[in-house]
UniProtKB/Swiss-Prot annotation:
This is DNA repair protein RecO. GO terms for cellular component: bacterial nucleoid. Involved in DNA repair and RecF pathway recombination. HAMAP family: RecO.
C-alpha cells in the first residue's frame, strides 16, 4: 500500500546504473529508506525530488527494510542552500547530525520541525554558525545528554561567574572552577547564549549581535562536549571546520561579529 508523507531528503546512495536509495526524514514516521527507480536519469520524474535537502510530499510503499518511492512533489527544493558552498556545508552537517542521532522509523515530529525550520532559516541567509549552535544545543536533549545550565554542576549555585566543564557536564561557578583545570572560561554573553539556545523556540527568532570571540567560545564548548558524550562520528564536521576557517578569511568585517535574528 502506498502512503503519502511530508519529508526532507537526508541523503542518497546510487544503486545500480539508474537507481537511488533515498533516506528521508519524515514527519509521520521518522527516518525511512526507499528505492527510487530511475532517479539517476536526468529525465526521471524522481530526479529533482530526490536531491539532498529537498523538502516535499512523497508517496512511498513502506517495508521493514527499504521501501519504494513512487512519486514526489517539491514544497521547497532548498536550492539556495545547495548553490552556496558555506550554506550547504552547515546544512549537510545538521542533517548528518540528525541522521546519526536517530533510528529508523522512530517518529519525532518535534525534531522534524526543528530540522525543517533550521534549514529554511539557513536558506533565507541567516547566520549559519548561530543556527548550527542552536541546533546542536537542542540535539543534546534529543540524544539524552543535556548539560547542566541552570546552576553550578557541583554545588548548585545560581549566581556569580561561570565557566563550562565537560567533565562535570555543565557550568561551574567561580568557587568550584578549580575542580576542573580543563574548564572553558566563558564570557557572560556565552553563558546567556548557551542557556538561550537550549530553551528558545526556534520559531520566535528576532535580532541580536554575536561577537566573533563569543562564537569561538560557544564552538569550543560544543565541540568538546559532543566529542566526550555524543559518541558520533560525523564526516561533515571536519569539512565544516575548514569551511569556517575559509569564511573567516573571506569575511569583509574581519571576523568582528555578526548580527542575527532572535
Amino acid at each position: 500500500m502506498f502512503e503519502t508523507c511530508e519529508a526532507i531528503v537526508m541523503r542518497t546512495v546510487d544503486y545500480g546504473e539508474t537507481n537511488k536509495i533515498v533516506t528521508l526524514f519524515t514527519r509521520e514516521w521518522g527516518k525511512v529508506a526507499a528505492m527510487a527507480r530511475g532517479a539517476k536519469k536526468p529525465s526521471s520524474r524522481l530526479s529533482a525530488v530526490t536531491q539532498p535537502l529537498s523538502y516535499g510530499h512523497y508517496v512511498i510503499r513502506r517495508s521493514r527494510g527499504v521501501g519504494v518511492l513512487h512519486q514526489g512533489e517539491l514544497i521547497d527544493s532548498m536550492r539556495a542552500l545547495r548553490e552556496d558552498l558555506f550554506a550547504a556545508a552547515y546544512a549537510v552537517y545538521i542533517v548528518e547530525l540528525t541522521d546519526k542521532s536517530t533510528e529508523e522509523q522512530k517518529r519525532n515530529p518535534y525534531l522534524f520541525e526543528l530540522l525543517l525550520q533550521t534549514l529554511q532559516y539557513m536558506s533565507e541567509g541567516r547566520d549559519l554558525e548561530i543556527l548550527t549552535f542552536i541546533y546542536e544545543m537542542k540535539m543534546l536533549a534529543v540524544l539524552g545528554i543535556p548539560p547542566v545550565l541552570d546552576r553550578c554542576a557541583r554545588c548548585g549555585a545560581t549566581e556569580g561567574r561561570f565557566s563550562f566543564s565537560v567533565k562535570e557536564a555543565g557550568f561551574l561557578c567561580h568557587r568550584c572552577e578549580a575542580s576542573d583545570p580543563h574548564r572553558f572560561p566563558l564570557s557572560s554573553a556565552s553563558v546567556r547564549l548557551l542557556r538561550l539556545f537550549f530553551h528558545i523556540d526556534l520559531a520566535r527568532l528576532g535580532s541580536i549581535s554575536v561577537k566573533e570571540s563569543t562564537k569561538m567560545e560557544l564552538g569550543a564548548v560544543l565541540s568538546a562536549y559532543y566529542d566526550e558524550y555524543a559518541g558520533l562520528s560525523l564526516k561533515t564536521k571536519r569539512f565544516l571546520q575548514q569551511i569556517g576557517e575559509l569564511k573567516d578569511k573571506l569575511s569583509p568585517d574581519g571576523g568582528q561579529g555578526a548580527s542575527f535574528s532572535l
